[in-house]
Amino acid sequence: MTHKNSCITLISPQNNKIKNTQGIKITSSAKKQILFLTKKNKKKIKLRLKKTGCAGFKYCMEEVVDTSTNLSEIIFYANDVSIIVNTNELHMLDGVKIDFVKEGLNYSFKFSHTKIKNFCGCGNSFEF
């Protein structure tokens, strides 16, 4: 039996500052894992890009304790899930889809985005 992993879209209440945003899409399994990681300690997730590899970037998620955001950050949220994004990276992170998948014995977050043009040969980085 196949089970389709439904998505929710996180939006920002700051849409008046940022025009034409698509939001951040997360699957139900990603939502469940993010809530598991953040609820107990009331942390939030910060999504960012890290320069690395042969192609240029990779996605990074980190837990942040300080919930006060500064003017250079935007919070996307829906259904008890919050993800913080730096405004300098918004044009590259807006529209990303986050999933939490099992590959062999390991579980990990997987990211997909229509703006990605190329992946490096090893698959560890990409370019827009």
UniProtKB/Swiss-Prot annotation:
A single GO BP term for this record reads:
iron-sulfur cluster assembly
Q: Which SUPFAM superfamilies match?
A: HesB-like domain
Q: InterPro entries under this entry?
A: Fe-S_cluster_asmbl/transfer, FeS_biogenesis, FeS_cluster_insertion, FeS_cluster_insertion_CS, HesB-like_dom_sf
Q: Which domain of life is it from?
A: Bacteria
The terms describing its cellular component in GO are: cytosol
| GO molecular function, a single term | 2 iron, 2 sulfur cluster binding
- Entry similarity comment: Belongs to the HesB/IscA family.
State the name under which the record lists this protein.
Uncharacterized protein bbp_116
Task: Look up and give the organism this protein is from.
Answer: Buchnera aphidicola subsp. Baizongia pistaciae (strain Bp)
Ranked from the top, the taxonomy reads: Bacteria, Pseudomonadati, Pseudomonadota, Gammaproteobacteria, Enterobacterales
